[in-house]
Regions:
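Local sequence-structure signature of Cys/Sec-based thiol-disulfide redox active-site neighborhoods
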Residues: 1-24, 28-36
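Thiol/selenol-based redox catalytic cores and closely related redox-interacting motifs
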Residues: 33-116
């Protein structure tokens, strides 16, 4: 089993996800969104499963800095913004084959491990 974790090194939940998989000896490939933004196609997988609103971190500093509190964008515009501004993403985004999660989801990850 191998997972891919999208997040930033500064994000506490991303570090918890890395530790969760490390403690269970699951190989995890980390993608630091601050250095390498996620591709549009990769984000589309998460949008199709959860919707674009689930991916936007309305509590993030970047969200406030950009003044998005009153923003009313289409899903397409939000997706474009998330590609351009990866620090707006709610992290970690975790993918294992076709299984996906947004945010800290340890019980879900545990079920993935149990099923493998």
């Amino acid at each position: 089993m191998e997972v891919q974790i999208f997040g930033t090194r500064k994000c506490a939940d991303t570090r918890k996800a890395q530790r969760f998989f490390s403690e269970r000896r699951v190989r995890a490939h980390f993608v630091d969104l601050a250095e390498r933004p996620a591709a549009r196609g990769e984000l589309m997988r998460f949008v199709q499963r959860f919707g674009v609103s689930a991916l936007v971190d309305v509590e993030s500093r970047r969200y406030a800095d950009l003044g998005l509190r009153a923003a009313r964008f289409s899903d397409e515009r939000w997706l474009a913004l998330l590609v351009d501004e990866p620090l707006l993403l709610r992290t970690p985004l975790v993918r294992c084959q076709q299984r996906l999660t947004v945010g800290l989801a340890e019980s879900e990850w545990a079920s993935w491990i149990a099923a493998s």
